[in-house]
Amino acid sequence: MRGGSSLDSFPGKGTLHTLEIENFKSYKGKHTIGPFTRFTAIIGPNGSGKSNLMDAISFVLGEKPSSLRVRKYADLIHGAPINKPVAKKCRVTMNYKYSDGKVKAFTRGVNNGTSEHLLDGQTVTSAAYSQEMESINIFIKARNFLVYQGAIENIAMKTPKERTQLFEELSRSHEFQAEYERLKVEMTKAEDDTQHNMNKRRGIAQEKREAKMEKDEAEKYQTMKNELAAKSTMLFLHQLFHCERTIDESKEEINAQKKTIASLEATRSKEEAKIAAVHQEHRKALREVQKMTRKLDQKETDLAEKQQNMLTLKVSVAHEHKKLEIAKKMLAAAESKAENNSTQLADLKKSKKELEKKKAAYEAEIQDMMQRGELNLSDEQVREYGQLKDQAQRESAMVQRELLMAEQVFEGDKSSLNHELRRQKEHQERVKAKEGDVRRIETQIATLAQRIKETEEETKILKADLKKIENDVVIDKSAAAEYNKELVAVVRQLSEASGDSAEGERNQRRTEALEGLKKNFPESVYGRLVDLCQPSHKRFNIATTKILQKHMNSIVCDTEETAAKAIVYLKDHRYPPETFLPNDALVVNPLNEKLREIKKPAGVKLVFDVINPQHQAARKALQFVCGNALVCESQEDAKQLAYGGGELKDRFKAVSMDGTLFQQSGVMSGGSADLRQKSKKWDEKVVKQLREKRNQLNEKIADLQKHRRRELEVESVRSKINGNEQRLAMMKRDLKNMREMQLERLQNELEGMTAEMNMLPPRISNCQEKLERSESTLKSLQTKSNEVADRIFADFCTRVGIASIRDYENREMRIKQEMEDKLRSFDDDIQKLAYEIDFVTEQDGNRKVEVEKEKVSQIDRQYKDMKKKEKTAAAALKEHTESMEQDKEVLEEKKALSHKLETEWNEVKKIAQVAMKDFTKAEKELLRLESLLTKKQYERHSLLHSVKLGQIALPLKSGSMADVEYEEDDGDDTASQSSQSATDGPSVSEEQIQREQHIKINYDSLPREYKDVDDDDGVRQMSNRLNVEIDELQKNVSKMNAPNLKANQRMAEVKEREAESTEELENARKKAKRIRQQFEKVKTDRYRRFQDFFDPVANTIDDIYKQLSRNTSAQAFLGADNMEEPYLDGIQYNCVAPGKRFRPMDNLSGGEKTIAALALLFAVHGRNPAPFFVLDEIDAALDNTNIGKVASYICESAREHMQIIVISLKEEFYNKADSLIGIFPYPAACTTSGVLTFDLTRFKQIGLNEMTENPPTPSIAT
């Protein structure tokens, strides 16, 4: 840079001298920028690369790629953003000049995607490079040397905590932060340990006082424990003695019962073998029935699917047939149009050929005429004519030139008029053809719209049908769900009533007999008495069963004759005998009405009154069976009435609620257990009704299952609707395409043609007017030319014998013009016919016919394929139906076989049940004996376990208590609880029981009175007496706190721990004191380093803000929230602009925020100055007034304190710099920057006049 000011005398350690950039971002190749002056401004248009120069400075000073607006180092190479890097590396070198003139080169580059650092050309580590930077007071983390674009306002808007962090980094007090926090944690922990040890010592003193109290209780406690042990030993000996005696007796009975069971087992096995054989055959027959049923169900499903498929094929055939008819209509229309086009094309070609012949004949006629020539001149006259013509042209040269131009204009206007007329005619024909296309498309649109309407109507009908079918399906499903719900309830009721188990053979036969009687005598046989009535409440079931006991299953009929016929029927069919109650033969006594008025005893009712007849025919039979029998609440009441102790003093037949019957004769009968079983007959009646309802529900559900084909029909209709909707969508898309694309395009083209044609008449009128004007001009010039020619050719015309030379020339010209017009007319007509031929040829009707023929052929093939599939499906449906009928016949045969085998199986099973009953009875007795044995063995184990658990010393003859294992459950020392556990049957292995058999107890010490007890009650009473004595002793023991028998040992341990806790407390106090001293030292160092930096900044910031504002009324304040430890809390920064009241920082204007941020930056920089300061567009938010203030301050600072480099776009700012660096872009695919340097110091000295006389030339950085 020429004339650049020197910085050799610049105060401080040194300055940024020059910057060398090679292939960095937009700087292609190598550039040397500088030398930099005290105040250097970098200018240039947006996008030229100014910020890239800022990035280059930041890069060489150690910034990371993320701060340089790239993701990785390789993106810094020129061309990398467009994937065309110019090299594999880039480099930036900062030549730093010390105050003694020495220059050090700081170089940082990118090589193969990694960063490298060099000092004076020597490669160094990143740490060494940063250390060298810090030696010249450049700290990259604190960024005390640069401000990025847009960051100036963020500096002012930092939060107090962020401002504190900034001061921590600048003051380097954060270097003490880790040690500070570590010591603070250790100090807190040491103080907590000290407090813990102090509390521990207090607890040990309390424990020492308690140890003495324990010793005094030990002896008293031990005396009572000894007495309790003696009583417990006596109790367990007593219980074990009687337990072992019962075990020996049970073993003898078990051996005898096993012999009986062996004999019964052989009989049972033989009968079960017979049952198994018949049952196997029955199950096989059932499986065949189920298999055939499933097969029929599947075939029924397949039949529904085939019927649905048949329906779908029929619909498809009809659809294809309709498509075929439409396609044939379209083919006929295309053939008709193609035929018309062929006829029209032949006529046009014929007309064109005739015109061409006429034109050729006319051209021959013209040639012949020209050869004849009506006016012939001699050669001499022709030469003379030529000479005179040349003379006339020379004398009228100016006029001839004007005449020639006028003729050209006239011919041009005439040609334009003819051209516009031809265009008008062509447009009229094209508009006519386009109107035909529009009409054709409109016809197609109308046809397609009609098809859409028909399809929509069909779809609407199908949707209505679908809705109806779906409603039917929903109703069926709802009904099925209700039936299933009812079925579940019925099955649950059957399960609860135990009525769903298999009926006995006898009951089943009797049920079949009654059903047969009802079928043969439907009007005469009413049913069993138990089925024809029902107790009014369940609590009367047992009492009414007792009264009706003999006749509960009797059959009620109308007459004795019917009863006789029914008995014959039963004998013929070998059914069990039945009891009949014919209404006409029953002798019924009237009811005693006084019995309904009995008050005492309370609750007495006639049995007849508590039974509700459910059939009118049952009333007489019910009255016959019940008579005047009474039902009472209790046995005492029934007994009182039966023995004449009631209000009426008469004897009556009475039954209590529990079924005890008292006769007038004094006979009493009970049998409550048997009555309870018989009373279930009432439940059996309900069960029977439930079974019937279950069967009805199963039949209904099965019928609904057969309606599943309706669901398939739903799917079929839905598929047809989907097909229609898809076709509708396609047709609507085609209709939309025709309307919006084809018709709209044709209409637009027609409108364009019409508009263009409407523009032609004015243009034709304009051409006619221009032609008239050019013709008038031509005639005027022609008159002037004729005057000259008449004068020159006057003698020649007289000699030749013509009135004027123009008569000769006009005749020749007229003939020539007429011939040319005639020929042009022929050409126009031929061209018009050629255009029409081309237009008709473009219609290509035959191609449309071929397309329609192919479409008809394709649809016809599809139609035939569908018909073939329909025929095949019909044959398959017929075959499937015939196969189903055959399978149904087979199913009926298999059902009959299954029923026969079931009857045989029931007969065999009845015989086996008797043997099974005897075997089961013997087995139950054996189980009872074994259970008693096991119970007593477990009881013995439980007693031994309790002895071992309670550490009770039993006298043993042999064995050891070690054979008794501990159980993993809670126990008690008392015999009563041990007995309870034995009763519950604890989980003990057989091996454990056998092992305990080796334990033989010595009962010599057991008194005789305890051994002589024979029954369980006596044993229980003796045990209870001992338990009472033991409980009393235990209560006395439990009232005492169990003493610690090792009290002396505990006292010694307490004293030893007391000494240890005293020592630990002293050590903790010393440690806490030492750590606190260390913490206070680190705290002081951190505080001093922070305050040494913060105080000068806080003291100078107000002056700097006043200087920037150029007003002494401006105020800036910087203060810490925490005065004792300012680095722990925030730092407040507030500014009061000149002439304004105090406002928070975020309420200041953009310019005021910028001035405040600059004041803070310059104050911080003044405390920890870097050798130079780089600012990127800090004036963005400043107006011209503030720019002037900031620029003046920077100029003063640059002369006195620091080197400043500023990127700016505002002339008011950069015109005060000492030098300018201009950045400009080169035109290229990738942004490429160029650099200019310009020295302004000489102009500050020589002034503007010299600059005007000798304008300087900027130097280009290389």
Swiss-Prot record:
Annotated region (Disordered), positions in chain: 965-994
Coiled-coil positions: 171-497, 680-937, 1017-1086
GO biological process, one term: response to UV
Cellular component terms (Gene Ontology): chromatin; cohesin complex; MIS12/MIND type complex; nucleus
The UniProt record lists the keyword DNA damage: yes
Keywords: Cell cycle, Cell division, Chromosome, Coiled coil, DNA damage, DNA repair, Mitosis, Nucleus
Bias kind Polar residues: ranges: 974-991
Domain SMC hinge positions: 524-642
Disruption phenotype: Defective chromosome segregation during germline mitosis, resulting in aneuploidy. RNAi-mediated knock-down is embryonic lethal and results in aberrant chromosome segregation in mitosis.
Extent of the signal sequence: none
Cellular compartments annotated: Nucleus; Chromosome
Pfam families per the UniProt record, alphabetical: SMC_hinge (PF06470), SMC_N (PF02463)
Short motif DA-box, span: 1148-1183
SMART domains: SMC_hinge
Function statement: Involved in chromosome cohesion during cell cycle and in DNA repair. Required for chromosome segregation during mitosis. Central component of cohesin complex. The cohesin complex is required for the cohesion of sister chromatids after DNA replication. The cohesin complex apparently forms a large proteinaceous ring within which sister chromatids can be trapped. At anaphase, the complex is cleaved and dissociates from chromatin, allowing sister chromatids to segregate.
Family of this protein: Belongs to the SMC family. SMC1 subfamily.
Protein name (Swiss-Prot/TrEMBL): Structural maintenance of chromosomes protein 1
Organism for this UniProt entry: Caenorhabditis elegans
